[in-house]
Curated annotation (Swiss-Prot):
Any one Pfam family match given in the protein's UniProt record, by short name: Vps16_N
Identification of the protein by name: Vacuolar protein sorting-associated protein 16 homolog
The species this protein was found in: Drosophila melanogaster (Fruit fly)
Role noted for this protein: Core component of the class C core vacuole/endosome tethering (CORVET) and the homotypic fusion and vacuole protein sorting (HOPS) tethering complexes involved in endo-lysosomal vesicle trafficking and lysosome biogenesis. The CORVET complex facilitates docking and fusion of endosomal vesicles during endosome maturation, acts upstream of HOPS, but is not involved in autophagic flux. The CORVET complex may cooperate with the early endosomal tether Rbsn-5 to mediate endosomal fusion.
Gene Ontology terms: cellular component: autophagosome; CORVET complex; cytosol; endosome; HOPS complex; late endosome membrane; lysosomal membrane; lysosome
Topological type in the membrane: Peripheral membrane protein
Entry annotated with the keyword Glycoprotein: no
Record key words, sorted: Autophagy, Cytoplasmic vesicle, Endosome, Lysosome, Membrane, Protein transport, Transport
Amino acid sequence: MPIMYNTGEWFKVRPDYYRKVELATPDWPLDLDLEYMWVEVAPYGGPLAVTRDPTKLVPVKGNARPMIRIFDTTGREMGHILWNHGKLIAMGWSDMEELICIQENATVFVYDMFGREKESYSIGDEASVTKIVEGKVFQSSAGTGVAVMTTSGRVFLKQNSSKTERKLPDIPNSSMNCSCWEIVTEGRNSYCLLGRDREVIKLFPGETVGTITANLFEKPHERIIKISVSYNHQHLALYTNTGLLWLGSVDMRQKYCEFDTGRKDMPLQMEWIMNSDNSEADAVVISYPSYLLIVNRNADRSDFPYDPVMFLVAEMDGVRIITQSSHEIIQRLPKCVENIFAVNSQEPASYLFEAQKKFEEKSYKSDEYLSMCREKIDLAVSECIEAASYEFCPETQKSLLRTAYFGKGFIRNHNPDEYMRIMRILRVLNTLRHERIAMPITFKQFSHLNTEVILSRLVFRKHYAIAIQVAKHLNLPESWILEHWAYHKVMNDPNDTEVARKITEKFKNPSVEGISFCNIASKAHQAGRDDLAIKLLELESRASLHVPLLLKMRKFDRAVGSATQSGDTELITQVLLEMKMHMMLSNLHMTIRDHPLALNIYKKIMRESNRAGLYGIYNTEDDQKAIAEYHFQNAIETEGLESNLSMIGNAYAQGRCTLEAELCADTSRLIKLQKTLSTKYNVSLNGLSIHETIQELLLIGELKEAERIRSEFKVPDRRFWWLRILTLSSQHKWEELEKLAKSKKSPIGYDPFVEVCLKQDNVMEARKYIPRCRDNRRVVWYMRANLFNEAIDSAFEQRDVHSLFELQKNQAIVNNGTLLSKVCDCIAMLEGK
């Protein structure tokens, strides 16, 4: 069944498939090296907080004061915090995308994503006196909380600034140091799990002392060094100093597996991969320097070489991986996606997908595939719609939705609501994932957050235009977005004039309904800014309130100004017609000269009603460019362009429009030349561009004439070579194409020669030019030409192991034992070296 290009990132951890999806390629600032940084990432595609890692030796550049920099997922800096407080112990993000920073003296500072401080509070006197050694920011049903461990080994929890801190029970034998700890949320309660030697200690609120669980591992080890709790707080992973991994339920009553990783080095992070289908966790991701290991509950594994430094971010349906050069997500493959794209899939959705492809190809096999899934076609359509929601690639989404659209035509009384809903959401998701917005969330995350939260996050990031479009697309009210923007301006911008100007520009669109300056003026008054409130009232742009009154008062200068600010062209036209009736033309011109939009509309009115009068305006203003355009339009309408080109060019020259004047001269020369050549060679060249003229001459074999035009009109060598190559290949003049390639060094390289040969299905000719292509392109061209033997040799000569691996996966090579053996031998030789 269908094998899509995106299956290349699938991998199996028996019995399930997982996939690694690239979300973006971050463009970090040149001075940011993540290897030396402490990074905290917000979930749901949120921002990153980055500061120097105090445990690493970092060359200090510039200001030596600690700084926390905040980036979005594309590497664009959103803000920064000059840390002028005490020692920073921990950082984390709240569910409201607030950065929470925990200081050594138990003070918590809260910042927004732009680095602006919002509030600060203390975790309590006892924690403040004894000092903090570690801290955690955790999520619960009650919101975001903070947990700290003091130098005395006590753990305190605080849900938010308004709640009282809670002290967890004492740690048994607290003189012994704990090596790791984590916070677990159970309903509305949160408790702590600590790893100490070979024990796990549970500190539950309300108890006097913690409870100890020991002997979880069967194999010998010295101590537990890492604890990881799944996103849903139902599963637990423990990692020992000897590389043993224990997976089980968070209450430690059920053990899934015990796995020996065989590694003695310290893991960087360990996170559970949540299942997007049923919110379960089936595997953990463990990161080491330059290495990533995935182990599931069945003790099966998969591993990848990776960047030396990486950061894992637990999500509700996967784990994001951020490195210096990549941003990816690892997910368990949704069952519906596997059903469609898995090799040899026998599922109805897979047959439907293939049927739709064959239907587009107009193949009779479409009906054969349809017959295989007709009994369960409703299930197939549902799976295609669901699979589209899980995909990140827009092309794959389109393919799946086309399949669903195709399939639902065979279902009587099919309800299209789900299809339309998913299509709308996917358009929103693709917009959010764009680098400009940088919110790479999944469909499941979008559904969990709900659209109101998404819109709020867009508004807070000041993506007001996108938020409005999303609201429109999802049939949600948009007025609150504009009101939020205006209120934000009123509260934060001290310049009354600037605020009034910005609000006017935003609200001048006549499509905006339900909002007036009166509402914003009222808020300005509530904020004690009466001057601004008056300005906002004066700037009301709706015709029923301001402009008609100004016209009645004959305040034409203010009327045209208000109408122009409103952006309503019909209103401006109404004002101009009134002015024309009651003012002398000279005064009217003087009034509207300071309002370019009104002036342009007035010219449009004159153009439609009095062209001669329009020419008089241009002469009065000595606007030579406009005069040239006036003559140009007249020439086109009267089909007298050739005879008027000289006059038009002179007008452009007087208006200092050098480029336009030169174009007129060139056009005149070209027209004359085309007439001569048309007569000489009995072909029609009239009305063609320079490019098309040269192409026609090449097609009839007049190379010298083409060379002459190229020289006279300064056609670049690259374009001319392209024209020759395309022309020769379209006429199958392969010997002349070869002569051209050998005549001198090609200014466009030799890739185009290969491309045109392959376009004409002439592999033998393409083979001649591939050796002359750049080294890094030869393997690609050999593969496109299905010259797999040469591709293998070329990749081996270039020591390109990556290309050899790609060749190894090629279906044609897999089916050819000789070629497959050759690829494997080459890989073995290169890796052996």
